[in-house]
């Protein structure tokens, strides 16, 4: 049995269906007013594929794994920070059970092959947040090219997703959504593939634009700021001068973990050396 066999195990999938769809989803949906759009764009989609989304709340991963049709994403595995979610047994069990989570190293450690690449090669779809950490303001940082590199290297599609209103409902620093069931809208985009000769950086930028294009019309309808109209994400107590020019968000390592971070994925898969994460 391989180290990744549990991610596609029917037994684990059955347990996850109960905990995720029959327990987690009702609790989450009762805390916010959730609407899901664009699932018809996933018709005919088959693993493996990568899901990418903007990231400003711990609601993001929950919304995506609970909203994606089970037939399409029942085995969807969520990347999670190894230095937070996999250091204590209760977090490891929790994230594995609810999110089919796999570890992403944010320390710069490289193994011969990333878990993400291995999962995709075994037809397990994955969820990544290419910004690498949650935004403090809802602004979107530059997408790191790791998810795009995985797509190019393995010749698989990427599904862009916009999570709209999650920052307003449960911003970074809150452990539960605000009272009153604030609205959150999740929009699935059509699967995308790299153009012939397109680099991971260029494809990643195109994926980020696709997320913006999904996000902004919905934000207008909800009466909240568009994704690029928000102030840059700055950790409380830090000056904006510490930001990388043009980054649009804080690129420092998250201090309390994020499910779905792809901060380290863009290493060797992006450079085609085959020695990733």
What does each model-found stretch correspond to?
Residues 44-107:
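Catalytic core of membrane glycerolipid acyltransferases/transacylases, capturing the structured
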Residues 6-33, 87-99, 171-181:
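Alpha-helical membrane-targeting segments
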Residues 30-37, 107-110, 168-170:
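Short gly/ser/thr-rich secondary-structure transition/capping motifs
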Residues 21-22, 35-39, 64-66, 113-115, ...:
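A generic local structural motif
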Residues 26-32, 103-107, 137:
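Short, flexible loop segments at the rims of nucleotide/cofactor-binding pockets, characterized by
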Residues 24-55:
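Helix-to-loop junction immediately C-terminal to a conserved catalytic motif
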Residues 2-11, 15, 110-277:
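Non-catalytic C-terminal accessory region of glycerolipid acyltransferases
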Residues 36, 51, 78-79, 186-188:
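Generic preference for hydrophobic
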């Amino acid at each position: 049995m391989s180290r990744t066999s549990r991610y596609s195990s029917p037994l684990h999938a059955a347990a996850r269906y109960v905990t995720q769809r029959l327990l987690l989803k009702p609790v989450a949906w009762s805390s916010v007013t959730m609407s899901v759009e664009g699932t018809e764009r996933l018709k005919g989609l088959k693993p493996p594929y990568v899901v990418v989304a903007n990231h400003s709340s711990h609601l993001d991963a929950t919304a995506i794994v609970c909203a994606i049709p089970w037939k399409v994403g029942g085995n969807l595995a969520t990347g999670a920070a190894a230095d937070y979610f996999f250091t204590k047994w209760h977090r490891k069990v929790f994230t594995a059970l609810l999110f089919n989570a796999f570890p992403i190293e944010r320390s710069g450690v490289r193994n011969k092959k990333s878990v993400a690449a291995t999962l995709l090669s075994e037809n397990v779809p994955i969820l990544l947040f290419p910004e690498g950490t949650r935004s403090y303001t809802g602004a979107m940082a530059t997408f790191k090219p790791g998810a795009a590199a995985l797509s190019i290297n393995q010749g698989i599609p990427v599904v862009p997703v916009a999570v709209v209103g999650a920052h307003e409902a449960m911003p970074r620093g809150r452990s539960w959504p605000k009272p009153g069931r604030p609205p959150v809208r999740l929009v699935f985009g059509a699967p995308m593939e790299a153009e012939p000769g397109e680099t991971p950086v260029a494809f990643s930028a195109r994926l980020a634009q696709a997320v913006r294009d999904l996000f902004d019309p919905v934000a207008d309808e909800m009466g909240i700021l568009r994704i690029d109209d928000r102030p840059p994400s700055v950790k409380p107590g830090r000056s904006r001068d510490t930001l990388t020019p043009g980054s649009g968000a804080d690129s420092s390592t998250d201090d309390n973990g994020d499910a779905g971070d792809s901060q380290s994925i863009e290493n060797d898969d992006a450079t085609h050396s085959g020695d990733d994460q």
